[in-house]
From Swiss-Prot:
EC number: 3.1.1.3
Location of the protein in the cell: Secreted
Protein name: Triacylglycerol lipase 1
Family: Belongs to the AB hydrolase superfamily. Lipase family.
Tissue expression remark: Expressed in seedlings, roots, leaves, flowers and siliques. Specifically expressed in the epidermis.
Principal subcellular localization: secreted
PROSITE patterns named among the record's database cross-references: LIPASE_SER
UniProt keywords, alphabetically: Gibberellin signaling pathway, Glycoprotein, Hydrolase, Lipid degradation, Lipid metabolism, Secreted, Signal
The organism of origin for this protein: Arabidopsis thaliana
Expression triggers: Stimulated during seed imbibition. Induced by gibberellins (GAs) and repressed by DELLA proteins (e.g. GAI/RGA2, RGA/RGA1/GRS and RGL2/SCL19) in an ATML1- and PDF2-dependent manner. Upon seed imbibition, increased GA levels in the epidermis reduce DELLA proteins abundance and release, in turn, ATML1 and PDF2 which activate LIP1 expression, thus enhancing germination potential.
Catalysed transformations (reactions): a triacylglycerol + H2O = a diacylglycerol + a fatty acid + H(+); 1,2,3-tributanoylglycerol + H2O = dibutanoylglycerol + butanoate + H(+); 1,2,3-trioctanoylglycerol + H2O = dioctanoylglycerol + octanoate + H(+)
Amino acid sequence: MKWLLVAVLTSLTIFSALTQSHLLHGSPVNSLCADLIHPANYSCTEHSIQTKDGYILALQRVASLGPRLQSGPPVLLQHGLFMAGDVWFLNSPKESLGFILADHGFDVWVGNVRGTRYSYGHVTLSDTDKEFWDWSWQDLAMYDLAEMIQYLYSISNSKIFLVGHSQGTIMSFAALTQPHVAEMVEAAALLCPISYLDHVTAPLVERMVFMHLDQMVVALGLHQINFRSDMLVKLVDSLCEGHMDCTDFLTSITGTNCCFNASKIEYYLDYEPHPSSVKNIRHLFQMIRKGTFAQYDYGYFKNLRTYGLSKPPEFILSHIPASLPMWMGYGGTDGLADVTDVEHTLAELPSSPELLYLEDYGHIDFVLGSSAKEDVYKHMIQFFRAKVKSSSW
């Protein structure tokens, strides 16, 4: 059983096997503004909202101190799995999307979902409670993202631009099928878009799914995946010392990345990875096994109690308004947002998004790639500018 526990916990992380001692001694980051934004000489204010199910979420509002101070429309950045809003600012200001958008005059807002170190609160629950971790990406979409969009909409009194990466695109697709959410969004730009996962090619992910490691984790009584816990770091240390090659762990989880600067791994590990829930991982694995874009599958009887149906309801991509402009960037070496699955998504949408396909780009390149500004972000910004209706910006 001990070897199984080691394998389960180790397999579910993107970064933990790369510099385990760094994770063990790194301290949690509590203020994105103080740690990354202010030192780069950008304006940043902290905001918080409470979701309908009681979670306290942190948002940051970022602006350039230059002449284009927040003259543009609001844009919400939604991170992916095991990440938080810091991922948009980890490279230099000339390379990081959050800073680049601010420099172009956008009113930049940074989302952080429940369970991350920035959004670790709840009105009644502690993070040590099992119930605190009883959520998956459908809750992140229907509660966290939907209510962040509502908050920005109420403050700016205008529709927002939405940017998502990886799990952030899963959340976006699900939320945008809801008319009351879609009507608050001006346009969406999705990096590594995912609604279907049945053609995942990342070798370690395929192995985990085949072995049903998500179900084994539940059997072991775990509810959160936190790669900064002493126990997990020590277990990963043990596994990587003579038992497996951990130097290429990122590729085995995400696919090959062309433009990710591996020399900055230790710096990135000051911030990533962030915690997530075991239930969330199980939901993602269900997507891989079943080939569906559906709500969480509790099994026949609990599905009946929860949904009134024997199978969980699917999110219908054709319910996203055809009038909502969309832009998507995806890569040929992405082991998670596989090209076949992206094409499946495109076939289900009622509109034809603008597309950027980069043959050599992988999953991490779109957020941390050193050449993403020229390869990706300038095209996204051109898309947004074409959708801005105000002539004053």
